[in-house]
Amino acid sequence: MVKEQVYKSTIKSRPLLFLEMKKVSILLNKGFKEFEVKEKAISENIFQVNTESRKKEIASSVLARLKILDDYLIREIGHGDIESSKAIVLYSIMKTDRLFFEFMNEVFKEKFVFGETFLTDADFNIFFENKQQQSEKVASWNDYTFYKLKQVYIRILFEAGYLKNQKGNREIERPLLNIDVVEHIRALGDGIYMDILVGE
């Protein structure tokens, strides 16, 4: 089920964060609470970043994504196969970022379903131009914001295993996902997200 969200561009500084999501998933599975994860992020620097503000930012972002997942999916991120774990992280980003979800649903899914080979610069440009026409909020962003969004979308898809490369002709990949994960997400009523991830 898709919940209406406001458009935001904070994803610019929050890529896939797969290893960070995996670390926190394992901690939550061990019984750690959210506040304890935040404390460990600062006192033990579990994300291995330089500044306190970045430690807090990553902890907040990771926990916000994990909050929309159930115990089974959190456990799968920590202990499941890597392709399915990354797909769950991608699912959590789509669930928490409206613009990224719309890009995946309106642009990436179409290419996936019809077996198109590449994700091009034009795909991004057309998508962002359309969103500027549809939303005053998006229209107020500057060119650099769109440049950074494009960069991070590409990086997320590459790190999640859905693109072979980040530069030039970005070839689309089709990861093999655990059928139990696929069916679980569909059973939650989130088939629209799963259709994107499996290309149906």
Curated annotation (Swiss-Prot):
One of its GO terms (biological process) is defense response to virus. It comes from the Bacteria. InterPro entries: BrxA, BrxA_sf. This is BREX protein BrxA. The keyword Iron-sulfur does not apply. The lineage of its organism: Bacteria, Bacillati, Bacillota, Bacilli, Bacillales. The gene is brxA. Induction: Part of the brxA-brxB-brxC-pglX operon. BREX systems (bacteriophage exclusion) provide immunity against bacteriophage. Part of a type 1 BREX system. This system allows phage adsorption but prevents phage DNA replication, without degradation of the phage DNA. Methylation of bacterial DNA by PglX probably guides self/non-self discrimination. When the brxA-brxB-brxC-pglX and pglZ-brxL operons are transformed into a susceptible B.subtilis strain (BEST7003) they confer resistance to bacteriophages SPbeta, SP16, Zeta, phi3T and SP02 and partial protection to phages SP01 and SP82G (these include lytic and temperate phage). Keywords: Antiviral defense. Belongs to the BrxA family. The keyword Transit peptide does not apply.
